[in-house]
Amino acid sequence: MKQIVPAFFIQLALGLYSPAHSNAAEPPENRIDVVLLGTGYPRPYPDRAGPSTAVIVNGRYFIVDAGRAVVLRLSALQQPMPQIAAVFLTHLHSDHTSGLPDLFNTSWVMGRKQPLQLYGPRGTQEMVNGLLKFYAEDIHIRRDLVEELPVKGAEIEVHIVSEGIVYKDDDVTITAFGVDHRPVEPAFGYKFEAGGKIVVISGDTAPSDNLVKFARGANILVHEVYMPGYFAKARSVEMTRGDTTKVTQRLSRYHTDAEQVGKIAAAAGVKKLVLTHLIPPEDSEKIRELAARNFSGEIVAAKDLTRVLP
C-alpha cells in the first residue's frame, strides 16, 4: 500500500515553513503591498537573490521576474506556493529568469494544481519549451510513476505581452508598458492598480519617458539603479587585465544611474521610490543619497525581503 505523507510535513522538510524575515510579516487582507524578493544583479552576492519582486494583492502573489533563489526568498515568507497567481517577466536576460525553473517545479511539488500562468515578451514560449524539455524526465517520474502529482500543475500557460492591460480581475489590473533596455527589445515594466493604489515596477531600463508616463502618481515606484561611475571604473579594471570586450562599457547605456532615478521619480510625482537591482549593492546608501538630490519623497534602498507599504 502506498504511504501518503501529509503535505504539511513535505513542506516542512523542504523548508517552506521557515521563520519569516522580520521585515516581511504577513499583510492584512484587502490591500496591495510589495516585497523585494531579490535585489541583486548578475554578479552573485550571498545576501542578494536575483531580481524578483512580489506584488501582493489580497493575499495572492504576483511575481515580477524570477532571478536566482526566488524560491528560497518565498520560503522565508512562509508563503504557500499555490497562492502564486502569476509570474510576469520584464525581459529575458538570464539574471531575471534563472529562478523560473525552480519556481515552476517547486510550486508544483508543493501543491499547485493548475498551469503556472506566465506573462512575458516574445521569446517566452521558446524559453518555456526548453524548460519543459529539460524537466521532461523529472515531470514523468513525479506525475506518472512515484508521486502522482496533479497533471495540470506540470504545465505552463504562456501569455505574450504587448503594451496595454495584460491581466485584470476583481482585485487588480496589471498593465505592461515599454521601457528602454535596448538592444534588448522588447522590454517591459508593469503597473499594478488595486484598492485605489498604484505600484509600478520598472524592470531594467535606461531613463524612459514612457515609464514616467505610466508611473505618474504611483504610490510606489520600484526602479533599478546603478552607482554613477561604477561601469567606467569596472571597465578600467578590465582593461588592465587585458579584457578587450566592451560589455561593461555598454552597460550604462541601458541602465539608470542614481541621480537619474531621482529625477524620474520627481517627474512622475510618485510617493515612494524603492531602489533595486542595485549596482553595486555595497554602495546602496550612497546610491540612495544621490537619488535624494533630485527627489524629496521617501526613498528605500531595498534589501532582500524588504516589505514596502503604499
PLM ranges: what are they?
Residues 2, 7-10, 23-213, 288-309:
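Binuclear metal-dependent hydrolase catalytic cores
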Residues 12-22:
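C-terminal segment of classical bacterial N-terminal signal peptides
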Residues 188-189, 198, 206-306:
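Cap/insert and terminal regions of metallo-dependent hydrolase folds
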Residues 6-7, 15, 228:
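Short amphipathic alpha-helical "recognition" segments used for binding
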